[in-house]
Design a protein with these regions (language model features):
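Alpha4 helix (beta4-alpha4-beta5 surface) of REC/receiver domains from two-component response regulators
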Residues: 64, 87-107, 116, 120
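A Lys-centered signature of the CheY-like receiver
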Residues: 111
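Short amphipathic alpha-helix used as the core "switch/output" element in two-component signaling
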Residues: 41, 63-76
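Active-site residues of response regulator receiver
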Residues: 10, 54, 84
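Two-component/phosphorelay signaling modules centered on CheY-like receiver
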Residues: 13-31
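Active-site beta3 strand of CheY-like receiver
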Residues: 46-52
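Receiver (REC) domain active-site loop signature in two-component systems and cognate sites
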Residues: 57
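Helix N-cap/capping motif at the beta->alpha junctions
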Residues: 32-41, 62
Length: 134
């Protein structure tokens, strides 16, 4: 069975490395991008099965990346899991979730996040995208 490709887009190097290792231990093929622009380019070249996307990043934020992908007929089907920390730039978790729903993100997790929650959400989104029951 072919490994599912996951694109992980986050500017936090420690989080990215830990999450990449976790997902690879679950037999996913993980590609990393460190900002929104790089993430958008890699989404086009890698054609991942799922994208994990941080909201607050330099160059282009996660909302912008998600909106561009979801409105593109070639990439709009790819499930997107948004991640973000609530803080000065993000007033509340519900605000982030509402924004994500407006741009058609498939799921949302506030940071800090438990590693196993990421795995569970990834597996659920992949099952849904393959037409299986969640």
């Amino acid at each position: 069975m072919e490994k599912k490709k996951i694109l992980l887009v986050d500017d936090d190097a420690d989080f990215t490395e830990a999450t990449k290792l976790l997902l690879e231990s679950r037999h996913y093929d993980v590609t990393v991008a460190n900002d929104g622009k790089e993430g958008l380019k890699k989404a086009h070249t890698e054609e991942p099965s799922l994208i994990i996307l941080d909201v607050m990043m330099p160059e282009m934020d996660g909302y912008q990346v998600c909106a561009k992908l979801k409105t593109d007929p070639k990439y709009g089907h790819i499930p997107i899991l948004l991640l973000t920390a609530v803080g000065e730039a993000i007033p509340t978790s519900s605000y982030t979730k509402e924004m994500g729903m407006r741009i058609e993100a498939d799921d949302y997790i506030p940071k800090p996040v438990e590693p196993l929650e990421i795995v569970e959400r990834v597996e659920k989104l992949l099952r849904i995208s393959m037409g299986k029951n969640p």
